[in-house]
From Swiss-Prot:
GO cellular component term, pick one: blood microparticle
Role according to the record: Involved in oxygen transport from the lung to the various peripheral tissues.
Name of this protein: Hemoglobin subunit beta
UniProt-listed InterPro entries: Globin, Globin-like_sf, Globin/Proto, Hemoglobin_b, Hemoglobin_oxygen_transport
Binding site for heme b: H64, H93
Modified-residue entries (N-acetylvaline), positions: V2
Lineage of the organism: Eukaryota, Metazoa, Chordata, Craniata, Vertebrata
Domain of life where this protein originates: Eukaryota
Length: 147
């Protein structure tokens, strides 16, 4: 559960309504794989990840980034039940994929940076603080199965 004020909820939903999920999803996942290269081990089937350019232009990275942000979008409509919303994904990432739950926090922080880059002055400190709460809540929900 994420506790947001009315102003914070409004800031999150207003900005999210302007997000191009295809573009931002691919960029966020790509940046995660470039900045934290050890995360690439979970994506060996994606083909060429040999350079930042290869990662950022990889169609499988872009497609999976879109899928990730689709799930994030779903979470935004269930802020009061993030653990329930992400229960199946938590189980998948824990039991089958064996993803280090710290990676969820890293991806959330990368997403905040990508949103700041895309929205510039519109990504105010208030908006950033609200998104930091949301990505922390999502990361916690995704890590829930690990506890």
């Amino acid at each position: 559960m994420v506790h947001l004020t009315g102003e914070e909820k409004s800031a999150v939903t207003t900005l999210w309504g302007k997000v191009n999920v295809d573009e931002v999803g691919g960029e966020a996942l790509g940046r995660l794989l470039v900045v934290y290269p050890w995360t690439q081990r979970f994506f060996e089937s994606f083909g060429d990840l040999s350079s930042p350019d290869a990662v950022m232009n990889n169609p499988k990275v872009k497609a999976h980034g879109k899928k990730v942000l689709g799930a994030f979008s779903d979470g935004l409509t269930h802020l009061d039940n993030l653990k329930g919303t992400f229960a199946q994904l938590s189980e998948l990432h824990c039991d089958k994929l064996h993803v280090d739950p710290e990676n969820f926090r890293l991806l959330g922080n990368v997403l905040v940076c990508v949103l700041a880059h895309h929205f510039g002055k519109e990504f105010t400190p208030t908006v950033q603080a609200a998104y930091q709460k949301v990505v922390a809540g999502v990361a916690n929900a995704l890590a829930h199965k690990y506890h």
